[in-house]
């Protein structure tokens, strides 16, 4: 049995930018995940379920657990003095860590993805993304350090809190998964160099919004539902409503996750920096693909911290099919 800490140290030589700081940073995220795991499992026993009454910068009602997870991760990262600052889906602006101007890294995160599912005991997750800062070390970080394209990520990953708690991450040298053993208090290696299955047979989308989807996406959904034995169709529809949970299932079983633009969200709804970029990095490292329907996610130059984007991620052949339908059936 190999722990996450042992694995990170063992694999440092494979990663050109590996430093003790990055190892400690991943350890801080691991600690934050343990705290969130503990409190999610007793959320119904303490008063951290439901809405907090506040809204985030996107105008969405924040759940109590969103704010709890955000504060715990922020505290874990700041305590190590190895992160110059963070950007979070739950923060209006970047958070600059005073006294950490010497740190080389910044972290972007969605502290609790799918938190509205907590009340009904459905899987949720934490998503994180790590970049090297671009401003001079020794000075406070600025927004410029966070507005980098996804292809500049040095590490990314997620934690899924389900029937078991798993941490999945990449540093650009494959995707590795670790299951949390609460009796020992450690994450143990369970899958090394994960890959999408050769063929995917599942599509994950909120079909309740079908009437609002672009023409190309509507055509793709019908394509998924048609019978064709040569391509193993019809595909199976599975949608949890938590990006982390849907992505994790599709990574293991093969499939595609779709969150297209709609009339109410013409640019898409998922956040480029906190959700799309880290999941795209993981997908590509696992042999998959991630796109906004026209462009590779990791090549998009971000313009703002909370920028949204359409998002299609999963098996390469399935994402390429979506792109083809979007090209062939443009909206009038």
From Swiss-Prot:
Q: In which pathway does it act?
A: Carbohydrate biosynthesis; gluconeogenesis
Q: List the disulfide bonds.
A: none
In this chain, Mg(2+) 1 is annotated as bound at 89, 110, 112
Query: GO molecular function of the protein, one example?
Result: magnesium ion binding
List its EC numbers: 3.1.3.11
Q: Which family does it belong to?
A: Belongs to the FBPase class 1 family.
Q: How does it assemble?
A: Homotetramer.
The name on file for this protein is: Fructose-1,6-bisphosphatase class 1
Species of the source: Salmonella arizonae (strain ATCC BAA-731 / CDC346-86 / RSK2980)
Taxonomic placement? Bacteria, Pseudomonadati, Pseudomonadota, Gammaproteobacteria, Enterobacterales
